[in-house]
């Protein structure tokens, strides 16, 4: 829980130094993207779903959330993932650039029926909210933002978590809790 909160607080605050302590690597282009980010005002209503990672000490974290663009009132839903692993000292860290094996594993998790249900419901809500705000829709189109909230997960989009991260056996709020981040 502390790892995820610190990570997203650092992203929100554009605190590159803190991010370097929480992820396994952060290259100069990532640093620049973080410090120059100006479009998203914030994230809220974060719900985190966790699936077992490739090892006993790793996790695939799916996070559904609402995000607000600067200058617009509409909250758009989105979803993304993080791959979390454990250091030798037992502390958790976020894998900034998952390797091919990890990406393949994440792709397998994206095919899970419950994850698909989460992606589909998020996409339907995104489409509905965007259709109700013509100005925001036009703005996002001008920015080159495609209309797929659900696919942000497949592309590894980053988010801000402002709540606890429960690790669950399955990608469902009702699944057995097996820990917290």
Where are the regions a protein language model picked out?
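SH3/SH3-like (including bacterial SH3b) beta-barrel domains
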Residues: 169-181
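A structural detector for beta-sheet-dominated domains
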Residues: 95, 160-162, 170
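Exposed beta-sheet edge and beta->alpha loop/turn motif
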Residues: 56-140, 149, 180-181
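Short solvent-exposed beta->alpha transition segments
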Residues: 16-65, 69-77
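Core segments of small alpha/beta cavity-forming domains
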Residues: 1-43, 105-153
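Second-shell loop/turn segments in exported
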Residues: 5-9, 70, 175
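Hydrophobic pocket/interface hotspot
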Residues: 7, 18-20, 61, 84, ...
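SH3-family beta-barrel domains
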Residues: 146-166
């Amino acid at each position: 829980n502390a790892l995820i909160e610190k990570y997203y607080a650092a992203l929100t605050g554009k605190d590159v130094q803190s991010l370097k302590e929480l992820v396994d690597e952060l290259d100069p282009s990532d640093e620049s993207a973080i410090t120059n980010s100006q479009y998203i005002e914030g994230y809220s209503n974060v719900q985190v779903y966790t699936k077992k990672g490739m090892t006993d000490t790793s996790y695939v974290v799916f996070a559904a959330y609402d995000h607000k663009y600067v200058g617009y009132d509409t909250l758009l839903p989105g979803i993304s993932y993080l791959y979390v692993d454990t250091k030798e000292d037992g502390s958790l860290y976020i894998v900034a650039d998952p390797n091919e094996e990890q990406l393949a594993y994440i792709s397998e998790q994206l095919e899970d029926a419950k994850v698909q249900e989460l992606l589909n419901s998020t996409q339907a809500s995104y489409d509905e909210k965007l259709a109700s705000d013509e100005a925001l829709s036009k703005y996002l189109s001008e920015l080159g933002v495609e209309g797929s909230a659900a696919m942000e997960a497949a592309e590894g989009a980053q988010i801000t978590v402002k709540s606890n991260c429960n690790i669950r056996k399955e990608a469902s709020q009702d699944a057995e809790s097996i820990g917290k981040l």
